[in-house]
Amino acid sequence: MSAFTPASEVLLRHSDDFEQSRILFAGDLQDDLPARLDTAASRAHTQQFHHWQVLSRQMGDNARFSLVATVDDVADCDTLIYYWPKNKPEAQFQLMNLLSLLPVGTDIFVVGENRSGVRSAEQMLADYAPLNKVDSARRCGLYFGRLEKQPVFDADKFWGEYSVDGLTVKTLPSVFSRDGLDVGSQLLLSTLTPHTKGKVLDVGCGAGVLSVAFARHSPKIRLTLCDVSAPAVEASRATLAANCVEGEVFASNVFSEVKGRFDMIISNPPFHDGMQTSLDAAQTLIRGAVRHLNSGGELRIVANAFLPYPDVLDETFGFHEVIAQTGRFKVYRAIMTRQAKKG
């Protein structure tokens, strides 16, 4: 998070305007501008654990991570700077939450890349904080308005669900596979062997569909699920509960909060972080897996066929297998043996 994003660079063109402001930063916080911008006071709220990790090192308790912001998270703020995400329902969840807490009269800035759909902020906030475009640069738009009316926010109304082969999947905005089981996960599930036993870690669990599907035909597995996303963590907990499956679910930046070793690690790792393409999480997953697998344990991941994971798998484990593939996806398996680097 050292370099500033285009959205932050647009904000820096107006840095003098923020020196006397008490600012709440929220949304898709891809850099550490909230910790570095000269303001009267700064807070940050994020639903992304890895963004909170970076910001909390510099901002301490003024950086908060949770699904839903609370009154304490916005205390004494007179300005909101919201970074528009690529997911419109995610923006609606977060903005309705934040605007329901901030006092009338709060200055509202919304910034984002044009390709993210930031211009739809005008329509979304029209009844609460009418926005005007005040700058356009770096293929981004910056919008300003003042909060005239607080919306009513009910997080429960944002929940959704769908069924997959008799399983109930609970979802929230921004959670991967929110609208149905993706093709990659289907391919990975097709490779899982019934009656598997042992400890299984699902990294980047999303809505928890991989874990509950695995548990249905392998009820003796002991599940641990983690994700960087607060909505994903809550969705996975709800999915497990809806299907009467037990498991531990928590927020983690890949393995940052994971303790112990497992017999299998499964994942459909992301290769985007917000609007940006990033292979960091998947490469961290592969390289770090050797520190969290028992001897003979297995890493099994699905990925777009064009992504350069075979080299990292071979470098880390000494070898890998492709156990299923389509034109778009491959399922990779690597076994923890003496050949594997011990991290």
From Swiss-Prot:
Entry keyword set: Cytoplasm, Methyltransferase, rRNA processing, S-adenosyl-L-methionine, Transferase
Transmembrane segment boundaries: none
UniProt-listed InterPro entries: DNA_methylase_N6_adenine_CS (IPR002052), Mtase_sm_N (IPR013675), rRNA_ssu_MeTfrase_C (IPR023543), RsmC/RlmG (IPR046977), SAM-dependent_MTases_sf (IPR029063), Small_mtfrase_dom (IPR007848)
Catalytic activity: guanosine(1207) in 16S rRNA + S-adenosyl-L-methionine = N(2)-methylguanosine(1207) in 16S rRNA + S-adenosyl-L-homocysteine + H(+)
GO cellular component labels: cytoplasm
Domain of life: Bacteria
GO molecular function, one term: 16S rRNA (guanine(1207)-N(2))-methyltransferase activity
Pfam families to which the protein is assigned, alphabetical: MTS, MTS_N
Subcellular location: Cytoplasm
HAMAP family: 16SrRNA_methyltr_C (MF_01862)
Job of this protein: Specifically methylates the guanine in position 1207 of 16S rRNA in the 30S particle.
Membership in a protein family: Belongs to the methyltransferase superfamily. RsmC family.
Protein name: Ribosomal RNA small subunit methyltransferase C
Organism: Shigella boydii serotype 4 (strain Sb227)
